[in-house]
Amino acid sequence: MVKKEESRLPQAGDFQLKEGSVVDATRKYSYFDLFRYSTRCERFLLVVSLLVATAASAFIPYFMIIYGEFTSLLVDRTVGVGTSSPAFALPMFGGGQQLTNASKEENNQAIIDDATAFGIGSLVGSVAMFLLITLAIDLANRIALNQIDRIRKLFLEAMLRQDIAWYDTSSGSNFASKMTEDLDKLKEGIGEKIVIVVFLIMTFVIGIVSAFVYGWKLTLVVLSCVPFIIAATSVVARLQGSLAEKELKSYSDAANVVEEVFSGIRTVFAFSGQEKEKERFGKLLIPAENTGRKKGLYSGMGNALSWLIIYLCMALAIWYGVTLILDERDLPDRVYTPAVLVIVLFAVIMGAQNLGFASPHVEAIAVATAAGQTLFNIIDRPSQVDPMDEKGNRPENTAGHIRFEGIRFRYPARPDVEILKGLTVDVLPGQTVAFVGASGCGKSTLIQLMQRFYDPEAGSVKLDGRDLRTLNVGWLRSQIGVVGQEPVLFATTIGENIRYGRPSATQADIEKAARAANCHDFITRLPKGYDTQVGEKGAQISGGQKQRIAIARALVRQPQVLLLDEATSALDPTSEKRVQSALELASQGPTTLVVAHRLSTITNADKIVFLKDGVVAEQGTHEELMERRGLYCELVSITQRKEATEADEGAVAGRPLQKSQNLSDEETDDDEEDEEEDEEPELQTSGSSRDSGFRASTRRKRRSQRRKKKKDKEVVSKVSFTQLMKLNSPEWRFIVVGGIASVMHGATFPLWGLFFGDFFGILSDGDDDVVRAEVLKISMIFVGIGLMAGLGNMLQTYMFTTAGVKMTTRLRKRAFGTIIGQDIAYFDDERNSVGALCSRLASDCSNVQGATGARVGTMLQAVATLVVGMVVGFVFSWQQTLLTLVTLPLVCLSVYLEGRFIMKSAQKAKASIEEASQVAVEAITNIRTVNGLCLERQVLDQYVQQIDRVDIACRRKVRFRGLVFALGQAAPFLAYGISMYYGGILVAEERMNYEDIIKVAEALIFGSWMLGQALAYAPNVNDAILSAGRLMDLFKRTSTQPNPPQSPYNTVEKSEGDIVYENVGFEYPTRKGTPILQGLNLTIKKSTTVALVGPSGSGKSTCVQLLLRYYDPVSGSVNLSGVPSTEFPLDTLRSKLGLVSQEPVLFDRTIAENIAYGNNFRDDVSMQEIIEAAKKSNIHNFISALPQGYDTRLGKTSQLSGGQKQRIAIARALVRNPKILILDEATSALDLESEKVVQQALDEARSGRTCLTIAHRLTTVRNADLICVLKRGVVVEHGTHDELMALNKIYANLYLMQQVSG
């Protein structure tokens, strides 16, 4: 038995679902569910951090108590009452002595003692509070990082565990966005935010308790406002959570488009779809912008109501409080004194204000909960076919007896279309069974069922008599080798790609498999041999080479079951002959299932099964089926008649078949060795390339990668906060109104302090009626200030939020537009992989909004409070003002130091996250290949390595976060101590009135306090500055390709003339020093068909890419009507080119939209034009038979067969009515019947058009007006088919050998 593989994520394994548990995929998660992946120790430490935060919050009521006692004693000792108010806290520090009928001198000395005690008490409290908050935030952040680290790993693991059916039907599976934006939001909500919220809420709770202890009557009156504040806050939080989910959904849909476009960037360029994609992306951002504005409106209204209630409550408190004080004024054992009024008022009001300050943090928690909803729904979803599950049987021996029994099946994304209808096929051990039939009949479906990508809805698939559903999924797939029609290679070395077939394979095993797959020679001729990087999706090598590496990967696996789905479709004749022999040799041991359109490759099969309409129409050996004279015989007869005609014509034109057969092995060996010395990438329609694989193979490779990373280290422009704000300049109207509102709101705090000082001054008046009248006036003023604060806060929040979301939408659109406006070389850069670009686009724009929008209003409000407070302070006492401001440099210095530190560590964290995203996105994008090769654990291991680096960088980032926030909270109270200590001395020396020192202190301390609240957003600002630098660098970048404006010199008509390659030299930007074309000269006359042939790597696809201007020549030129292609506007040039590539990319649009995509220069492509193009490509009948017809949506992993996708791609090219048609193996994926019809359609389409064709199957180009044979990047032979056959050299040899093998 195979040993159970140990989990490589022990820290995540403790959090898997229990066996047999059932999870609702639509379950709603509470905030507490966000901590489900914390350990017991972490939960204990989190509780400790919250208790520590609670202890820290107790110091705010403590400050209110000593402040109330001190201010009350100031009044008593200045007025000279009979007996001063009792004190409980100040005596601990040497003050608060209760005097009776004291002299003026005694009172003044007592004031100095009280001031000293207050200063000492403030210092002790500030230090204690600073230490406690630092500890609480540091603990919470570390715990949050641990959990996010686990959730990242678990999320990828959950994605890798999902069945293919989920990928087919999932509309929001954009991986890069979830791994960056959603997890960042989750981290925000489970880290310091929860500590800050608890700190602010417990300040309120403990303040209420203190207030009740000192004066329950007044406390009850003041508390009357609290239910309204709590109600407003809770309603806003609930609305915020609901809207946050909608906002995330909108951004998720937009991120899907980004990932899809970047993955198919060459297709977008070929059909000039940039504007259409920008429009699609922009439309998907509109709901997010509208939702964001609503969030701002609701938040503003809630905050406004809270502030209005707070000021109304203060007005009521001082009015009622004075009544209580005056009633007991002359009593020796009075309860209500100015001290009690201050303690109750400040304890309750500051607590209520803290509830208001908690609002944005509560919003972050609501957003985190919404983000957790999307993440946990995936993590908790039980996969129907889990490739990483240890359950299931693992037989010791595998004979390879396969039986498909009564199979009924329909794809999950197309439940109305039944593909297999009761199919039964028996495959004996060691047999080679071939499946043939029209495109879409279910051949490839059987291959997928064999791998358990899907389970049949009826019937069963059995291996050695065991239902596949009873076998361990990983074990089953480890027994199978697969070579698909469109093989996927990963962005690592050639050697590593082959080793993925069997991780334990030695270098000798790899080379043996490569020789069998006929790719060893071209690999060893590369400068780095098996260490050559293939690029993302194998973009750096040709299609034929990619397929041979995939074959080597399957062969090194030494499988018991071999699945070949058009395994040689991308090979040239020479390679095909050799690889076919290798495959036949490899298939002698294992049971082999073959899907083939070329019947010549399956005549030796032990059994041939002809499928039609989802059932077996015929089965038997080649000879048996020919004798039966049924469907198979008819298909073979058509093929033989076609090939006989072509062979006869070839023999007449050139040389006998036998001679070709005898010479082929010798001559083509030399040709291939010569021509594969320098390799070219194929004409890809997929993404870019990068330099990272799933795992490092040697220490030397890791050292090389480190050197390369150091060399290519990202240098980000430095951006000031002013430059950051300039990004928001188009929204200046909102910012101006919001700025005025922020200043208005900020000014209310020092104004309140000013009148609060007057209130204390009034208390010294001996006439009770005067006191009552003046206090009533001040109460009314407080109501006015409340209205001013409420209106200012609402406008501030709404205007800045609107400015922020509008800016974010604009930045996302501009960044997306800038990226797709780059040249292909930009996407070839390893730093610009699909995963990295998606991650960058999502996080950078989000980060910039994180420091703009509503947070700018909060910071501007804090500055306004401080400035107005300073003005008030200098008016009343410049000495006390200067001394009070001594703490501000400490606060500002802490922000500066944190900023410098965060900028460095955030850059490292960003780079590490991008690398991790690259690994993950590549795996998820190619999930079928990952599943087929059982690479899930390897992907996870590599991702874990990258995430560990992210974790280190993030821990450095938060190291000083607690210190800075704690300093922002503690510094204002230290400032209180300093200010009131010095103010008390000034009062004792009769240099200042006691009410004035209260005015100065309140005005300034509120400014300092507001600055402390603004410090909660310091990390957002630092992240935003870093992201803004990256965005500005991006915006400055322009394509290196010239794109001249339209002129009479480069008209559309000019692009329709002769095409001339004039002494063209070219090497790919990512492979400098490896020339592909070396002085190529080629003329393509207008309205003629020219075919480029030659073995893989000879430069054929490069010629096409230069014509499409994916790249420009290094030397020489490509001319159209005598005008160099670089003189044409890109859109003008590409508008007349119709491309059908070897591996077509279709987008997540309807079939009609995909076909109409061929003509992006018009918005009014009619349905009639679409249908006509579909008919020409022989796909109309298939589309019409679908339940939704042309409105059928093609998802990311649509269940169309290769032939169906190819025909839609052909329709897409034809709908634009191109003057130049480019066919790169356009019929390679079609069955014989479809190929014949489509070839006729292409022949008709070529009429009156210039046509450039690339083909390995030379029979498809024999009617071309000119055939050019390329070798080492130059044309070595050219002429018509007959002329080249008569020449009796390379082309004749290739052609006749293909006829013999066919």
Swiss-Prot record:
EC class (word): translocase
Transmembrane region(s): 47-67, 117-145, 193-213, 221-240, 301-322, 340-360, 735-756, 780-801, 856-876, 878-897, 960-980, 997-1017
Xref: PROSITE patterns: ABC_TM1F (PS50929), ABC_TRANSPORTER_1 (PS00211), ABC_TRANSPORTER_2 (PS50893)
Classification via Pfam families: ABC_membrane (PF00664), ABC_tran (PF00005)
Annotated positions binding ATP 2: G1094, P1095, S1096, G1097, S1098, G1099, K1100, S1101
Bilayer topology annotation: Multi-pass membrane protein
Record region (Disordered): 644-714
MF GO annotations: ABC-type xenobiotic transporter activity; ATP binding; ATP hydrolysis activity; ATPase-coupled transmembrane transporter activity; efflux transmembrane transporter activity; xenobiotic transmembrane transporter activity
One term under GO cellular component: ATP-binding cassette (ABC) transporter complex
Superkingdom to which the source organism belongs: Eukaryota
Protein name: Multidrug resistance protein homolog 49
Gene name of the record: Mdr49
